[in-house]
């Protein structure tokens, strides 16, 4: 007999009414009596790995739980190439959410490294969250990931994400399909984009954590190095403005960070492409594309750095960079 969830959190009729207003991302708070320690002084902390197919909405979910942007988001596969840790802290708990690259079959050294990150993070986690995209049918990829999670034997839960795109009937069908994956634990219908269902999910994840002290300062939201954070924000704007093979074929590297006398920051960055034709697309007619990428990226960099940022952005070609082990090391994709 297959295991079934103890319950489907939030599946009452009141849950559907909650979509009328929705919750702003990061606006939720757990009541004191919902916290595991209940004000007793006991704390819980640990790592929760988020696993799922590409485009399941893992990064959006991490941002919703943390209450701010720590992982870039786009509708392109391979948006997440590095292990991203988002940190959410309450009065007596701390969740370290590990946003893993989407599980896929490795095709080159880049994707081999991405899948290696998945395997290592699952082995080191305290709990695992399987994230399913409600806009995708449950398929072989989801079953493969569910088996991998069962094999590590950690406390687990399942999220059916993007339920704001579904009516009640399709959501209930998705929850049933999630239960058929044989995962232990609860299934949570969630809209990470709107924040609906996030408080119930957080409360449950906290209860899966071991007792222990906080792993990071309470005000820290991510442990990514500054250069990587800035490069990711530039890459996000590149992904949002390109199509077809270009998003898969670009990476961003920060060459230099230069402190200016007026307190602003000058960022020297380059976009790596694999072919001259991709470089032409990224530059655009009269330089319009790279200018648009740079303008949008500067706004994000200003917010991230908390000060004025100047961006010197160039586009370069490095054929076969996804197979260049030295460059992958330098980019921090390990």
How would you label these PLM feature ranges?
Residues 4-37:
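Amphipathic alpha-helical dimerization/coiled-coil segments
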Residues 38-116, 120-124:
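Conserved G1/Walker A P-loop phosphate-binding module
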Residues 57, 197, 289:
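Conserved glycine(s) of the Walker
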Residues 68, 87-91, 106, 121-128, ...:
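Conserved, well-folded catalytic cores of nucleic-acid-processing
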Residues 92, 116-186:
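Conserved C-terminal guanine-recognition region of P-loop GTPase G domains, centered on the G4
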Residues 99, 161, 191:
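Active-site glycine-centered loops adjacent to acidic/histidine catalytic or metal-binding residues
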Residues 155, 164-222:
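Canonical P-loop GTPase G-domain recognition
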Residues 226-334:
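P-loop NTP-binding site
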């Amino acid at each position: 007999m297959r295991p079934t969830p103890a319950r489907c959190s939030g599946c009452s009729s009141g849950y559907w009414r909650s979509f009328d207003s929705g919750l702003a991302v990061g606006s939720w708070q757990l009541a004191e009596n919902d916290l595991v320690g209940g004000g007793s002084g006991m704390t819980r902390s640990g790592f929760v790995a988020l696993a799922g197919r590409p485009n399941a909405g893992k990064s959006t979910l991490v941002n919703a739980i943390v209450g701010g942007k720590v992982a870039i988001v786009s509708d392109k596969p391979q948006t997440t190439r590095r292990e991203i840790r988002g940190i959410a802290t309450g009065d007596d708990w701390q969740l370290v959410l590990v946003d893993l690259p989407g599980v896929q079959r490795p095709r080159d050294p880049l994707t081999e490294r991405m899948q290696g990150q998945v395997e290592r993070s699952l082995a080191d986690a305290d709990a695992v969250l399987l994230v399913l995209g409600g806009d995708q049918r449950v398929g072989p990829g989801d079953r493969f990931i569910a088996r991998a999670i069962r094999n590590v034997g950690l406390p687990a839960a399942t999220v059916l994400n993007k339920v704001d795109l579904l009516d009640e009937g399709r959501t209930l069908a998705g929850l049933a399909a999630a239960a058929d994956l044989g995962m232990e634990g609860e299934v949570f219908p969630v809209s990470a984009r709107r924040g609906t269902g996030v408080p119930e999910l957080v409360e449950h994840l906290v209860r899966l954590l071991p007792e222990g002290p906080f792993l990071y300062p309470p005000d820290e939201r991510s442990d990514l190095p500054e250069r990587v954070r800035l490069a990711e924000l530039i890459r996000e704007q590149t992904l949002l403005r390109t199509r077809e093979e270009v998003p898969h074929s670009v990476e961003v590297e920060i060459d230099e960070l230069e402190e200016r006398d007026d307190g602003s920051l000058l960022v020297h960055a380059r976009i790596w492409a694999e072919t001259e034709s991709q470089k032409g697309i990224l530059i655009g007619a009269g330089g319009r594309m790279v200018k648009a990428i740079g303008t949008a990226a500067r706004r994000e960099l200003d917010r991230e750095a908390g000060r004025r940022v100047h961006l010197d952005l160039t586009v370069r070609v490095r054929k076969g960079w996804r197979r260049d082990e030295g460059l992958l090391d330098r980019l921090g994709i390990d």
